[in-house]
């Protein structure tokens, strides 16, 4: 069953401005080490960061809290599987909020889709609960 749904559309130019203005301070505050390493290894860094930013916003919406309600940016992180497929990894308060959404004796899978077409980056999150076992 679906217990959370979120989407976000981010302007890549906005992320470019944040990177130019705040540089490493912005990147360190928002993105996990894995996200930074992935984005910095790519030619289109700003597009990569923008997709990950959109994914975090979409995830916070799917969790029902938004960013302002105690969930830290780094409590949500996009990880790419060896196949390249992106997944969302939750820790700390984001993980606790996810547990609150789940019916008893259920686990969750977080489905993530990200795309970009300059100047836009977009992400969708679906949180699905399924019975354990």
UniProtKB/Swiss-Prot annotation:
Its main location: cytoplasm. It is an enzyme of class 2 (transferase). Mg(2+) binds at residues 8, 57. It comes from the Bacteria. Its EC number is 2.7.8.7. Its cofactor is Mg(2+). GO terms for molecular function: holo-[acyl-carrier-protein] synthase activity; magnesium ion binding. GO terms for biological process: fatty acid biosynthetic process. It is found in: Cytoplasm. Keywords: Cytoplasm, Fatty acid biosynthesis, Fatty acid metabolism, Lipid biosynthesis, Lipid metabolism, Magnesium, Metal-binding, Transferase. GO terms for cellular component: cytoplasm. Signal peptide: none annotated. It catalyses: apo-[ACP] + CoA = holo-[ACP] + adenosine 3',5'-bisphosphate + H(+). InterPro entries: 4-PPantetheinyl_Trfase_dom (IPR008278), 4-PPantetheinyl_Trfase_dom_sf (IPR037143), ACPS (IPR002582), Ppantetheine-prot_Trfase_dom (IPR004568). Transfers the 4'-phosphopantetheine moiety from coenzyme A to a Ser of acyl-carrier-protein. Belongs to the P-Pant transferase superfamily. AcpS family. This is Holo-[acyl-carrier-protein] synthase. The lineage of its organism: Bacteria, Pseudomonadati, Pseudomonadota, Alphaproteobacteria, Hyphomicrobiales.
């Amino acid at each position: 069953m679906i217990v959370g749904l979120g989407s976000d559309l981010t302007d890549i130019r906005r992320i470019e401005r944040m990177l130019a203005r705040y540089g490493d301070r912005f990147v360190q505050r928002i993105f996990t080490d894995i996200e930074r390493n992935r984005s910095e290894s790519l030619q289109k860094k700003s597009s990569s960061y923008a997709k990950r930013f959109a994914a975090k916003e979409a995830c916070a919406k799917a969790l029902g809290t938004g960013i302002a309600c105690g969930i830290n940016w780094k409590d949500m992180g996009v990880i790419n599987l060896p196949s390249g497929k992106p997944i969302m990894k939750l820790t700390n308060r984001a993980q606790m909020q996810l547990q609150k959404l789940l019916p008893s004796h259920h686990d969750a899978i977080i489905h993530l889709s990200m795309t970009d077409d300059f100047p836009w980056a977009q992400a969708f999150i679906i949180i699905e609960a399924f019975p354990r076992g």
